[in-house]
């Protein structure tokens, strides 16, 4: 069983017997139509693209109500195209990892072309220019990570031959401008707040610089700034797509699926002919398009206005997912866990995040209307975090915690203040913040040192707790005033809102010798 065996819906019995869902559409017909009249180019050929946007389009094609595929362009790691796309006719196998330990297998054939987005690849770049000049093009989109939207001064000085992704995209937009100021929507699908603004700011920066350098007419800058021509909608995406998993590899090999090996590129991208991802997924997009769009709602995408996208983001980041992640990761590191899924089998930790979410954060949740916060958090606690296939580690999640506490917990505290709610309802959120002062010591609950995850403020914050020791008996905790008064870290001065002393008391308990972390966590979780 190989991906290249599948041509024009060749539904061999063996695939069906082994539980593989094959495309229900005419692959060659979709390829031909897309080549002539492309509607969508996606930048970023990584695993998240194949597991989510490409799979959503595959579902839309399977419905029989749409007939165009997506063309993928890679602007960073060109080996992905040569090794993970072209040898397999641009098809891939999506393996859906369920929290029950079961898997679902689906062949994704919605990608019709794969291109290297750089002028050094002459044919590929010429094809991209041709696509951008075609009036049929409706949308370009991105999963290139937040760093991919960066603009470097050196790149701005390279004129019309930039090397960074945003510069290349702006150069392609210039081709579209020259073809008649054709309309287009530029759509970020990366997991960062107000992602459309990041693309917009980058494109506008390049365009303005090129006008200043006399390389392009001022009308080009006006074109990318004209929202009747070019738009940059916001979106909220949520799906975990880990590296190819050895357990999944073995399951596929046992089926007789031969394309089951892992590919590691020179740039250290981990990819494969298959992609494994969690079952739960959300993609909500601001419906602000200038030239039409592919009907991705046929594959489950939610379209709404910008305010609703922002509310969904706040619901996730401030209440239903990110605070739970941070809470269990701070304590998970001190309790020597290395897997989030394993933490979910710990009664104290599981109850800890349940009560933070449902009892303390949910009274002030931002309800977006199109997604139910209770259903969202229920999926997080009951399906996503316990998923045995998800190799996510608390050590990864606590990276840069100093930059995350204000949004993940400070916003909830501020909402209690703004609404005049009783802050005595806040017990476990203060316990998270107390745990941070204990985590910064880098000593686990057995008294052994552990490696603290990278954080830009680590040295400064560790210096604050340096006088403290993990020991029984009296010690001076007055240094904590220098931590918990920091609104730049917590979003509020915790003393000014009446929580500072409560948190200090919890820190004292957490520092009271070996075993104090477990004892304190259990005490407050049970009492809550």
Language model regions located:
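Substrate/ligand-engaging "lid" and interaction regions
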Residues: 1-43, 47-528
């Amino acid at each position: 069983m190989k991906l290249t065996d599948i041509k024009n819906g060749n539904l061999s019995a063996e695939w069906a017997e082994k539980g593989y869902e094959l495309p229900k559409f005419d692959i060659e017909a979709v390829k031909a139509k897309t080549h002539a009249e492309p509607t969508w180019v996606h930048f970023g050929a990584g695993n998240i693209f194949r597991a989510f946007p490409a799979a959503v389009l595959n579902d839309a094609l399977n419905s029989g109500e749409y007939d165009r595929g997506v063309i993928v362009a890679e602007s960073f790691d060109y080996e992905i195209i040569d090794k993970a796309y072209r040898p397999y006719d641009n098809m891939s196998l999506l393996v859906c990892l369920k929290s029950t330990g079961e898997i679902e297998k689906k062949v994704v054939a919605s990608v019709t072309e794969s291109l290297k987005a750089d002028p050094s690849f002459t044919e590929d770049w010429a094809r991209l220019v041709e696509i951008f000049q075609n009036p049929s093009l409706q949308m370009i989109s991105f999963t290139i990570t937040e760093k991919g939207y960066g603009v470097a001064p050196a790149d701005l000085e390279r004129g019309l031959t930039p090397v960074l992704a945003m510069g290349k995209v702006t150069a392609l937009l210039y081709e579209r401008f020259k073809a008649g100021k054709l309309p287009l929507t530029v759509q970020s699908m990366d997991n960062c707040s107000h992602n459309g603004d990041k693309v917009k700011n980058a494109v506008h920066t390049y365009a303005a610089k090129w006008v200043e350098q006399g390389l392009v007419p001022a009308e080009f800058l006006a074109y990318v700034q004209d929202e009747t021509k070019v738009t940059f909608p916001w979106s909220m995406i949520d799906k975990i797509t880990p590296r190819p998993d050895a357990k999944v590899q073995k399951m596929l090999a046992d089926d007789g699926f031969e394309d089951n090996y892992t590919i590691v590129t020179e740039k250290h991208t981990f990819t494969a002919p298959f992609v494994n991802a969690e079952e739960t997924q959300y993609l909500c997009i601001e419906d602000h398009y200038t030239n039409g769009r592919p009907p991705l709602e046929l594959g489950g995408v939610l379209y709404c206005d910008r305010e609703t996208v922002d509310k969904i983001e706040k619901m996730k980041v401030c209440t239903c997912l990110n605070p739970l992640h941070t809470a269990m990761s701070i304590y998970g590191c001190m309790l020597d866990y290395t897997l989030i899924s394993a933490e979910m089998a710990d009664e104290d930790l599981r109850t800890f995040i349940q009560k933070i979410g449902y009892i303390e954060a949910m009274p002030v949740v931002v309800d977006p209307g199109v997604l139910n916060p209770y259903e969202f958090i229920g999926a997080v606690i009951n399906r996503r975090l316990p998923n045995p296939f998800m190799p996510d580690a608390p050590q990864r999640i606590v990276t840069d915690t100093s930059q995350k506490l204000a949004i993940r917990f400070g916003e909830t505290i501020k909402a209690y203040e703004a609404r005049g709610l009783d802050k005595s309802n806040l017990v476990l959120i203060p316990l998270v913040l107390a745990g941070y002062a204990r985590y910064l010591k880098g000593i686990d609950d057995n008294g052994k040192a552990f490696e603290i995850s990278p954080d830009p403020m680590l040295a400064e914050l560790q210096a604050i707790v340096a006088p403290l020791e993990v020991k029984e008996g009296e010690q001076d905790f007055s240094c904590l005033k220098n931590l918990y008064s920091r609104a730049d870290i917590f979003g509020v001065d915790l003393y000014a809102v009446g929580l500072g002393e409560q948190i200090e008391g919890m820190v004292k308990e957490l520092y009271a010798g070996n075993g104090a972390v477990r004892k304190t966590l259990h005490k407050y979780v049970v009492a809550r």
